[in-house]
Amino acid sequence: LTLLDQNQIISPNKHFRLFATSNTVGLGDTTGLYHGTQQINQGQMDRWSIVSTLNYLPNDHEMDIVLSKLPSMSSNEGKKIISRMIAVAELTRNAFVNGDISTVMSPRTVINWAQNLEIFKDIAFSFRVTFLNKCDELERTTVAEFFQRCFDQELPESLMSSTDINSKAKDE
């Protein structure tokens, strides 16, 4: 690093590393999921000698992160609930990758869901206000089915018939 105005050169420590993150790998966003991102020019991209893709953590690591934020859920019952929450998240992630839904549940969302569960004491309501209400209305049935698979509990959104959804789509 050169500080021209001070006529000084700063040498980095031998262990110095610089990391950057990008949801679009510098390519910009045509999907609208990351509004406001810009494409990075090739000169800038060429300065990064290593580019790596990081996917979601294994379930047990995600569990550890959630429990670190919510130690009150460390009981066997709490861990069972968090495990099911992570299973719902994994279903949304797979559906997102397959193009079936446009909203994905991040580990941050799982933490928020667990925190809301502590507040509201209702797994379905906390799911709805944390994640389901953020989903496209036409995709809520699919997402509600993921919840039903993992918690064996029906949500009103999962009971909507495809006819109801198609009528809403036509009305818009």
What do the predicted segments below correspond to?
Residues 1-172:
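C-terminal regulatory/interaction module of P-loop NTP-utilizing enzymes
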